[in-house]
């Protein structure tokens, strides 16, 4: 069974919060590329989902995909792909749905901090609404969302 995590990096693995290192030039040095500025604890949560589901990552971020892909690969994340760069939210939805259809994906989730999430859900077909998981850009990928994603990808809900 092929499982995919469509990942928007900004707001999911890097967050907007004064209490985190994302906003400073000094990052946690787990990821040496300053442009990526991913929070290590958020990346570990993504790693948990992948380890527990055997899902592959498809980057949907309009945010420095080249260095993000390189840094994730350097940290042993495999099976990386990406959608076209810098898609607006309507094109992103269509891009995801086309990718799912063309690649015969069995299960997928979308981790995105899109601010107009209700409008997105209006555009998504009913059978896929649970696959779109709203992320609060000030918290990023939480433990609760990680567990939900794990259960969804493994047909436990």
Regions found by a protein language model. Give the residues of each.
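Short amphipathic alpha-helices and their capping/turn segments at secondary-structure boundaries
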Residues: 1-4, 100
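C-terminal cap/substrate-recognition subdomain and adjoining C-terminal extension
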Residues: 70-157
